């Protein structure tokens, strides 16, 4: 069972979990609340704490209680101060798990499950902090970073000292009365009794660098950057190679033993001359011993439990990990059918960074991923995926584009075929070598049309638009206006059958193509490309370098996201024939008496967009989190960032909504979170049988929104007291409405029975429902 911890005691979990099934049955998660979806698929480190095993996996933490096989997760929604844990340790004297994040932020998780957040290192004002190592000695945490060695006093919850070396500190160790640091420029030692804040007190005694320093068997030792173990004479700096084989990991156990890991081989040392080795069934990242039990972190196999017997190593349990996404990367997300989220973790490889091929499905509260055992079958790397699309006639048939290897086809979750330059209508950018032919077939912007044809962009080739027909045959459509352009991110059909695509960089712009009713004949087609210069309603010309996203709202207006902010194409129907289309900017009055206004989100790099059932705009940005805008954009209703919400990152990659329950899913560079939104798919007609209110009754300890679902679009809601007074009124967001239990003056309403009168947009039908409030 997975249980989510809060800042309060563990007893509070039962109450929280009792509530969740009620909300789940009706609304996903409550309006205004959050649920994190971190990956727990690469277990790398574990330690014993509070009678449980704490596991670090994909930069997140979970705990396993062997007494009842309970799994406990904790994240930003449950009180952690940050995301992406770089190192974890345990302070026995303070009964605290120490979590050091990749940005230097620190959380102390105590045995009563309270959390103390320490931000001084993160907010040090000297630039970004990256963490290389954490060692806990007594009540001190020694944190090796890119800015030096930081000593954190766990008991006093403060920084004791910061020793700066003007270079990376990879590892540190306290050996007798000396602190020894391995840095990018060699090893330094300093007497603990000296004023080590004075750099001159540190003595450089070797040019050799070590990834990890440690003390064992009365000797100073280190794991070098070529993964060999050496002993180090601290006086002469003489090195003796002790273990030549490739050491991929090591740990010092609480019982004093040293554990060295070499892929699947794990050796337990009582001393450097007294050891026992075991072979594990798969790669091991870390090992923790507890009597005769051995807890191994084995990557995708999660936490595994073994016993040491006279017959050797015996597996007792494996795959001890919470259900979670495969990875923390959500480049593209969509809902191809009700109840199914389809996510792709990849990129367009702008920075020449290769992301493992990742396609994930979230359905029925479970995460699964598509087959990844592909390179052995294709001979090319499976990486940098761009977008996935589900066959509208077969939910088990999925196509996925990639930045270099072509179009992947999956059936029933298993890899079926790679469509590439030599077996399809697709083309490679480079044709000089076999390697280049196989690795420069760039496919993105996948979309099915009503006839079941699969459209896509074959980037940076002469013929950009390629189409695979239902019978597997291919054809291409050539347009000189877009030939050779490198990056198309979206391809969509409007209600008139026109194609809209966006060239996102290097001559970015908006493209509209009218096929004129002839699918394969492009001589009678009309095409319009506009960019990279946009002219706004003031006649001002603005140059964009990125056109990242577009979407059409309920008023038929196209909202366009760029590196300069938002633009609006008021009449998309006239765009293709308009010689000088106007891309309007929303203006926000300064309200300072000057009569001046500023452009909405001017200069803000927009990366993602979603228009919900209330016609509100959810805007994702490169480094400023998420904005929720009113339907016309003139009001900012919410602004979520990492500092005021559980967002794991302010770099937003994707946004989508589960229209059934109104939950928003935000994909970021550090993982996904879900937010209980106020809008959902509307009903076609207003009917008492569809209307549902929850929670109802409202209990005294409830602090949230009452949600009314089953409404038609733009229904009006009037909430009346039992005596007939108007208490509250509003308009539905799609098929739902959320009430914060306040009256027209913003005051909390008292106990009583309230009546919601709901009228459809046409004002020809009304229904009512009751809400009981108990204070």
Tell me what each language-model feature is.
Residues 1-32, 455, 500, 775:
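Bacterial Sec-dependent N-terminal signal peptides
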Residues 26-691, 726, 757:
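Carboxylate-rich, polar loop motifs that coordinate divalent cations or form catalytic acidic clusters
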Residues 374, 422, 733-734, 772:
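A generic structural motif
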Residues 393, 449, 494, 710-712, ...:
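Surface-exposed coil/turn segments at beta-strand junctions on protein surfaces, enriched
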Residues 716-727, 746, 754:
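Short, glycine-anchored, charge-dense loop/turn motifs used at functional sites
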Residues 766-771:
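Edge beta-strands of extracellular beta-sandwich domains
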């Amino acid at each position: 069972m997975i249980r989510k911890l809060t800042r309060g005691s563990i007893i509070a979990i039962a109450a929280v979990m009792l509530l969740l099934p009620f909300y789940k049955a009706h609304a996903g998660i409550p309006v205004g609340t959050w649920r994190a979806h971190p990956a727990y698929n690469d277990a790398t480190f574990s330690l014993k704490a509070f009678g449980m095993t704490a596991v670090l996996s994909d930069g997140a933490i979970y705990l396993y209680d062997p007494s009842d096989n309970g799994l406990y997760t904790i994240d930003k929604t449950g009180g952690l101060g940050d995301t992406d844990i770089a190192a974890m340790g345990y302070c026995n004297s303070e009964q605290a798990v120490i979590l050091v994040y990749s940005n230097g932020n620190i959380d102390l998780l105590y045995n009563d499950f309270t959390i103390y957040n320490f931000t001084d290192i993160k907010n040090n004002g000297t630039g970004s902090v990256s963490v290389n190592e954490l060692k806990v000695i007594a009540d001190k945490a020694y944190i090796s970073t890119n800015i030096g060695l930081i000593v954190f006093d766990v008991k006093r919850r403060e920084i004791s000292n910061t020793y700066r070396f003007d270079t990376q500190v990879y590892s540190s160790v306290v050996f007798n009365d000396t602190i020894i640091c391995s840095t990018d420029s060699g090893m330094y030692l300093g007497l603990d009794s000296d004023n080590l804040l004075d750099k001159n007190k540190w003595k450089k005694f070797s040019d050799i660098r070590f990834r990890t320093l440690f003390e064992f068997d009365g000797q100073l030792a280190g794991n070098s950057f070529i993964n060999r173990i050496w002993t180090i004479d601290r006086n002469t700096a003489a090195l003796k190679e002790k273990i030549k084989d490739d050491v991929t990991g090591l740990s010092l156990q609480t019982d004093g033993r040293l554990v060295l890991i070499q892929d699947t081989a794990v050796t337990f040392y009582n001393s450097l001359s007294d050891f026992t080795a075991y072979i594990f069934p798969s790669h091991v990242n870390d090992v923790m011993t507890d009597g005769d039990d051995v807890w191994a972190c084995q990557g995708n196999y999660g936490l595994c439990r073994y016993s040491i017997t006279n017959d050797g190593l015996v597996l007792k349990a494996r795959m001890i990990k919470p259900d979670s996404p495969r990875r923390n990367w959500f480049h593209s997300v969509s809902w191809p059918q009700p109840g199914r989220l389809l996510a792709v973790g990849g990129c367009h490889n702008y920075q020449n960074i290769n992301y493992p091929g990742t396609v994930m499905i979230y359905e029925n509260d479970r995460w699964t991923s598509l087959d990844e055992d592909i390179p052995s079958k294709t001979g090319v790397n499976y990486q940098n995926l761009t977008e996935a699309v589900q066959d509208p006639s077969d939910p088990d048939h999925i196509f996925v584009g990639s930045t270099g290897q072509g179009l992947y086809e999956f059936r029933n979750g298993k890899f079926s075929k790679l469509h590439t330059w030599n077996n399809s209508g697709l083309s490679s950018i480079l044709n000089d070598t076999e390697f280049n032919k196989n690795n420069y077939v760039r496919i993105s912007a996948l979309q099915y049309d009503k006839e079941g044809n699969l459209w896509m962009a074959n980037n940076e080739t002469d013929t950009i638009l390629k189409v695979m027909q239902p019978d597997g045959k291919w054809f291409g459509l050539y347009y000189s206006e877009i030939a050779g352009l490198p990056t198309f991110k979206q391809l969509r059909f409007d209600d008139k059958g026109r194609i809209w695509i966006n060239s996102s960089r290097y001559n970015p712009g908006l493209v509209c193509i009218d096929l004129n009713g002839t699918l394969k004949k492009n001589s009678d087609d009309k095409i319009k490309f506009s960019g990279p210069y946009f002219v706004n309603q003031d006649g001002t010309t603005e140059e964009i370098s990125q056109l990242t996203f577009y979407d059409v709202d309920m008023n038929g207006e196209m909202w366009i996201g760029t590196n300069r902010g938002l633009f609006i194409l008021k009449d998309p129907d006239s765009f293709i024939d308009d010689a000088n289309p106007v891309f309007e900017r929303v203006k926000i009055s300064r309200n300072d008496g000057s009569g001046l206004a500023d452009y909405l989100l001017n200069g803000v790099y927009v990366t993602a967009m979603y228009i919900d059932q209330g016609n509100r705009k959810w805007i994702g940005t490169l480094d400023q989190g998420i904005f929720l805008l009113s339907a016309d954009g003139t009001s900012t209703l919410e602004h979520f960032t990492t500092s005021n919400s559980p967002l794991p990152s302010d770099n937003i990659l994707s946004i989508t909504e589960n229209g059934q329950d109104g939950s928003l899913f935000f994909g970021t560079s550090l993982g996904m979170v879900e937010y209980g939104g106020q809008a959902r798919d509307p009903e076609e007609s207003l009917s008492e049988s569809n209307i549902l209110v929850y929670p109802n009754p409202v209990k005294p300890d409830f602090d949230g929104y009452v949600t009314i679902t089953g409404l038609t679009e733009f229904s009006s809601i009037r909430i009346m007291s039992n005596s007939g007074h108007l208490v509250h009124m509003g308009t539905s967001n799609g098929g739902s409405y959320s009430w914060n239990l306040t009256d027209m003056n913003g005051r909390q309403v008292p106990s009583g029975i309230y009546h919601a009168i709901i009228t459809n947009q046409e004002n020809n039908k009304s229904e009512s429902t009751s809400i009981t409030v108990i204070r």
